[in-house]
A protein has these predicted regions:
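Short arginine-rich
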Residues: 71-76, 142-144
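Conserved Nudix-box catalytic region and its N-terminal flanking loop in Nudix hydrolases
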Residues: 28-74
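Nudix hydrolase/Nudix homology domain
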Residues: 42-43, 109-152
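Active-site-adjacent beta-strand/loop module that shapes the phosphate/pyrophosphate-binding cleft
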Residues: 82-113, 123
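Acidic, metal-coordinating catalytic segment for phosphate/diphosphate chemistry
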Residues: 1-22, 28, 92
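Sequence/structural signature of beta-propeller domains
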Residues: 14, 76-81
Length: 152
């Protein structure tokens, strides 16, 4: 899979929101979710990124999972749109308001080398651990809650 950089092919909707594809990457048994470290600030996030004009949304989700987390996935469910609920002070030119489309996915392979390995760690979390780790990102928490992950 080819890694991409830049936003020259980035999609935006009629409201000016950046269209972002993301995944809730789970183990086959649905007991663990893989989170990655944010590059913008401290904390954990789900793999996600811009949906580009020359790809389908599912392709963007698969590409972002590879680039950011080094995983090969199988998309299982479309979790639908998730509204960006970040307050205006957390938005910027580099992080504009977004409309997220999340997919539940099964992780098939974790690669040892991937495009963003040098700037991100990845870690498996239980549902309760992930809820705590994503507590300051309501849009990511909503995606997790829409998934079929076991709530134990």
């Amino acid at each position: 899979m080819e890694s991409r950089t830049g936003r020259n092919k980035q999609r935006y909707n009629s409201k000016g929101e950046r269209l972002v594809a993301g995944v809730v990457p789970l183990t086959e048994d649905r007991l663990y979710v893989l989170l990655i470290q944010s590059t913008r600030r401290k904390g954990w996030v789900l793999p996600k990124g811009g949906w580009e004009s020359d790809e389908e949304c599912t392709e963007a989700a698969e590409r972002e999972a590879w680039e950011e987390a080094g995983i090969i996935i199988r998309i299982d469910y479309d979790l639908g749109d998730v509204i960006d609920s970040r307050p205006p002070k957390r938005l910027s030119k580099d992080a504009p308001k977004a409309l997220y489309r999340f997919y539940e996915a099964t992780v098939l392979t974790e690669e040892n080398n991937w495009p963003e390995k040098h700037k991100r760690e990845r870690q498996w979390f239980t549902y309760s651990q992930a809820k705590e780790a994503l507590s300051d990102r309501p849009e990511l928490l909503q995606a997790l809650e829409l998934s079929t992950m076991h709530r134990s």
